[in-house]
């Protein structure tokens, strides 16, 4: 029987590449995005159906879930990919930005997971693959506290759910990625700024330089991330956590090699 994968955030970047990857390999794909009326690439495939979805909107999540199940009959794998990041001093962040960061990166996956649990229970199994970041297991850059918070929360959510859902044959997996090439990297970042407070200017200048450099190098080939998603979905990998990319693996090696105080001092010194 043909398997079906449900993916959030497929309008561009990693989400779109994942949808195309699975469609080309014979899977049915429920591809979701906030603006399906603007999509052209995915509509060329008969085994891809597009559903309107903003993961922050519980009613839209429920509607997209019900429609996907009605159209395909059974969903085997759900990929929580939709997400973005807020950077800048916490002092500058608007209340709306704080709420947005948590709503998109944490409440969004919660909404999708809760919507699919009755379906997975009815079919006595299923898999959630949550797209996290190495920034969900360690800190690597100043001014990323809100993004770190959201990804640390996603990691904790996924690990905590493992114990609830394992007895029901519902699997949970984490992909911990860095930025990827061709993923409109900076389009997925919101910067917190303040025109009057200058105390953070030097630090922000160094952080912005890192972001600018990331556009040219240090980003991973997104296909390596898609390949890991495919391995998890097909049983080729049984890992609970999959850390993808050179930067994340290098930082994790450093984090595991030294006490936390030494690690934090090392990262801070890179921006001194």
Over which residues does each language-model region extend?
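Active-site helix of classical SDR
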Residues: 113, 150
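Substrate-binding pocket helix/loop in short-chain dehydrogenase/reductase
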Residues: 89-90, 97-100
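C-terminal beta-strand-loop-alpha-helix "lid" module of Rossmann-like NAD(P)-dependent dehydrogenases
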Residues: 168-213
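A glycine-rich helix->loop->beta "capping" turn
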Residues: 67-80, 86
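Conserved glycine-rich cofactor-binding loop
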Residues: 11-12
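The beta1-alpha1 cofactor-binding region of Rossmann-like NAD(H)/NADP(H)-dependent oxidoreductases
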Residues: 53-63, 95
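Residue(s) in the substrate-gating loop at a strand-loop-helix junction
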Residues: 133
């Amino acid at each position: 029987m043909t398997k079906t994968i449900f993916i959030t955030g497929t309008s561009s970047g990693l989400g779109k590449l994942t949808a195309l990857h699975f469609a080309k390999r014979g899977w049915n794909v429920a591809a979701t995005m906030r603006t399906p009326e603007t999509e052209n690439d995915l509509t060329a495939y008969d085994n891809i159906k597009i559903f309107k979805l903003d993961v922050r909107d519980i009613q839209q999540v429920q509607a997209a879930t019900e429609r996907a199940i009605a159209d395909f009959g059974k969903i085997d794998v759900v990929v929580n990919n939709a997400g973005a990041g807020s950077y800048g001093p916490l002092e500058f962040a608007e209340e709306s930005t704080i709420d947005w960061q948590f709503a998109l990166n944490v409440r969004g996956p919660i909404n999708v997971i809760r919507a699919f649990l009755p379906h997975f229970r009815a079919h006595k199994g299923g898999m959630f693959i949550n797209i996290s970041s190495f920034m969900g297991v360690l800190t690597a850059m100043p001014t990323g506290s809100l993004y770190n918070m959201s990804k640390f929360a996603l990691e904790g959510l996924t690990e905590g759910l493992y114990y609830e859902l394992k007895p029901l044959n519902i699997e949970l997996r984490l992909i911990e990625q860095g930025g990827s090439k061709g993923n409109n990297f900076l389009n997925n970042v919101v910067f917190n700024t303040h025109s009057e407070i200058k105390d953070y200017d030097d630090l922000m200048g160094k952080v912005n330089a890192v972001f600018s450099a990331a556009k040219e190098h240090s980003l991973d080939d997104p296909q390596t991330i898609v390949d890991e998603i495919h391995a998890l979905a097909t049983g080729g990998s049984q890992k609970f956590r999959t850390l993808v990319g050179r930067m994340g693996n290098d930082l994790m090696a450093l984090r595991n090699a030294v006490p936390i105080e030494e690690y934090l001092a090392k990262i801070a010194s890179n921006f001194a």
